[in-house]
């Protein structure tokens, strides 16, 4: 099965021609957008030797610059990762994203979202994670044990599969419904105790790229009130 057979398919009432016109800035360079999603997904996984080497040698920056140039994306943030010892990436990841230092920034969607019939949040494995497990089952995929089903790296990877499958309706719907929390992740990262310069930079980069992507897909930005509610759900300590 393809990702487009997953649950919660987008409303297809709009004509195909209308949707293609709306998504054309992404449609025309879908392979490059897919590659950018994969690049960022790999960067936001637990750091491994390949990622550490790519940061240290400049390979990651070179790939990022090439894709951003191809996609004609203009960002205020530098495309050069901050200097950080590659040996410290694992500690930085755990400090910033997994709560070894408080406050921290949960890198999964559920904590920022309302918990089923209540507005409270702050917990892992909420409705977003349950939906993602359904989506993975629909494509005969499994969630890696080390990650929440709605971890940002897995969401990016799933988005890349939608682009690869060529279903831009599903891609647009998924971008709208599963990445609205990125501004809250950025705010939580700003307030986190960990230094983690590379991962702080990656979170800002991701958030700014999705501002561009929403604009090209004509999706609305999350409101300030929405972001504040999301931050309130994770609490002062992440």
PLM features per residue range, with description:
Residues 2-238:
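Charged, alpha-helix-forming regions
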């Amino acid at each position: 099965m393809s990702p487009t057979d997953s649950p919660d398919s987008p409303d297809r009432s709009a004509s195909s021609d209308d949707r293609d016109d709306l998504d054309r800035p992404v449609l025309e360079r879908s392979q490059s957008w897919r590659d950018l999603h994969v690049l960022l997904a790999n960067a936001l996984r637990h750091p491994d030797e390949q990622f550490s080497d790519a940061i240290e040698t400049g390979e990651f920056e070179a790939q990022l610059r090439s894709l951003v140039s191809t996609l004609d994306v203009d960002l205020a943030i530098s495309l050069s990762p901050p200097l950080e010892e590659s040996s410290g990436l694992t500690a930085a990841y755990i400090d910033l994203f997994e709560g070894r230092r408080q406050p921290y920034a949960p890198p999964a969607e559920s904590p920022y979202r309302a918990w089923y019939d209540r507005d409270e949040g702050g917990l892992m494995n909420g409705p977003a994670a349950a939906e993602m497990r359904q989506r993975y089952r629909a494509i005969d995929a499994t969630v890696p044990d080390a990650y929440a089903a709605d971890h940002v790296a897995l969401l990016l990877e799933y988005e890349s599969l939608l682009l690869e499958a060529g279903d831009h309706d599903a891609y647009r719907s998924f971008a709208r419904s599963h990445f609205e929390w990125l501004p809250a992740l950025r705010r939580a990262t700003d307030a986190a105790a960990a230094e983690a310069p590379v991962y702080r930079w990656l979170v800002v980069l991701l958030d700014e790229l999705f501002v561009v992507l929403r604009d090209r897909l004509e999706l609305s930005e999350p409101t300030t009130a929405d972001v504040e509610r999301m931050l309130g759900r994770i609490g002062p300590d992440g």
